[in-house]
Amino acid sequence: MADLLNVLKDKLSGKNVKIVLPEGEDERVLTAATQLQATDYVTPIVLGDETKVQSLAQKLDLDISNIELINPATSELKAELVQSFVERRKGKATEEQAQELLNNVNYFGTMLVYAGKADGLVSGAAHSTGDTVRPALQIIKTKPGVSRTSGIFFMIKGDEQYIFGDCAINPELDSQGLAEIAVESAKSALSFGMDPKVAMLSFSTKGSAKSDDVTKVQEAVKLAQQKAEEEKLEAIIDGEFQFDAAIVPGVAEKKAPGAKLQGDANVFVFPSLEAGNIGYKIAQRLGGYDAVGPVLQGLNSPVNDLSRGCSIEDVYNLSIITAAQALQ
């Protein structure tokens, strides 16, 4: 974990990327904000009721005098953001509805990012994934050519570093969706200094089993390879592989001789949300890997979701990752 963060901090040095932390009334978030403020790579913007936040800071003995603190209910920016929200939603929200929605810290924070007043957002310490992601999908939306956002986890232990996806967002995926996630995951790997070798996973290796589920992954491999070639993406994408064939050279030699990947994959695209979510938790709980994420990909600007059981360190680390995404 330290190696990844050190690489990102080097990239971010002197950049002072503005990251919105909507949950300023949470002590973990406020503590992390003071730690980030002390760096030259992230400048936090904290949202919340001034009286509550200042009282919390006093209780925790935190100096927040240099942190930008915004109360969505009383901010001078609100009128401007309300108008921008109404225009962005194109008839799906009245001004009155927008006024009410922007009292919500996640909507207000997301609008700060959309309006260019911040570079990214980290939330979820006190909100559900839906509460964090919904405003992003409505306001920031996905990049051109990307139809969905997806959630990857960095799985880290010692000097081992892998990406697992999608483990957080999409319950049902067709071949096109899997291909898109494979390409976006490869781009994420590149942006974090990895040489992407993407394995698309199944219970079959190179046709060893036959079913509609296997066919879906096989089609996804072809689509992902085609998309990567069109975009001149420096990545290897191959499949379908069982997990052992994707990560153990000796198994790959027997099960998939001649495959582009020979047990050296570092990015794993799971065939379903079920498989991805279960897979990362097994690696985390039984394998002893640190699971950093979910890191959302495919959005026009970075928005990331914390676990409600997160630590101060988690808030800090995900803010660093979000800032690095903003520089892409």
Curated annotation (Swiss-Prot):
Keywords: Acyltransferase, Cytoplasm, Transferase. Pfam families: PTA_PTB (PF01515). Disulfide bonds: none annotated. It comes from the Bacteria. Its EC number is 2.3.1.8. InterPro entries: P_Ac_Bu_trans, P_AcTrfase, P_AcTrfase_dom1, P_AcTrfase_dom2, Phos_Acetyltrans/Butyryltrans, PTA_PTB. One of its GO terms (cellular component) is cytoplasm. It is found in: Cytoplasm. It catalyses: acetyl-CoA + phosphate = acetyl phosphate + CoA. GO terms for molecular function: phosphate acetyltransferase activity. Its main location: cytoplasm. GO terms for biological process: acetyl-CoA biosynthetic process. Pathway: Metabolic intermediate biosynthesis; acetyl-CoA biosynthesis; acetyl-CoA from acetate: step 2/2. Belongs to the phosphate acetyltransferase and butyryltransferase family. NCBIfam families: PRK09653.1, pta. This is Phosphate acetyltransferase.
